[in-house]
Regions:
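Catalytic histidine-centered segment of alpha/beta-hydrolase-like enzymes
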Residues: 102-116
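C-terminal alpha-helix
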Residues: 118-125
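Hydrophobic/aromatic anchor residues within beta-strands of the central parallel beta-sheet
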Residues: 6, 96-97
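Hydrolase active-site cap/lid region
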Residues: 1-48
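Acidic catalytic loop of the alpha/beta-hydrolase fold
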Residues: 72-77, 105-106
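Short alpha-helix in the alpha/beta-hydrolase fold that links the catalytic acid
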Residues: 55, 64, 78-87
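Active-site nucleophile elbow and catalytic-triad environment of alpha/beta-hydrolase enzymes
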Residues: 41-58, 64
Length: 125
């Protein structure tokens, strides 16, 4: 088994949640009917629907240690997705690092020293 632990940085709960949020945030569009149609097309073309791509379900099943990192100013993958993911992790060790005032994928840039320390500490346990 090659994977010892996971460092999850600005992760989303599901493809559906992320795409629906982006439709609303970026374009002011409701999820219906576009999400339903796009999910159906994805099923026809690639063999999977948006309902099947639920990262939160993978987190629920994971037994490997997981460090969750998220910027509290992230609007691309909303900060509100962090807590459900963290709470879904029921098996194995887990930890959380909230990067204050960091936007999407900027936790490392904004908090380089603390980010590095948290990751080293978590991986070293």
């Amino acid at each position: 088994d090659y994977v010892e632990c996971f460092v999850e940085d600005c992760g989303y709960t599901s493809v559906w949640d992320e795409f629906a949020g982006q439709l609303k945030e970026e374009f002011g569009l409701p999820s219906f009917p576009l999400m339903n149609t796009t999910s159906w097309l994805c099923q026809q073309r690639y063999g999977w629907s948006f309902d099947e791509a639920q990262q939160i379900k993978q987190v629920e099943r994971s037994t490997k240690p997981m460090l969750f990192i998220h910027g509290d100013a992230d609007t691309y993958v909303p900060y509100s997705m962090l807590r459900p993911l963290y709470e879904a992790k029921r098996h194995g060790r887990k930890a959380i690092f909230i990067a204050k005032d960091s936007e999407h994928a900027m936790a490392y840039r904004d908090h380089h020293k603390e980010y590095t320390e948290k990751v080293k500490e978590f991986v070293g346990e």
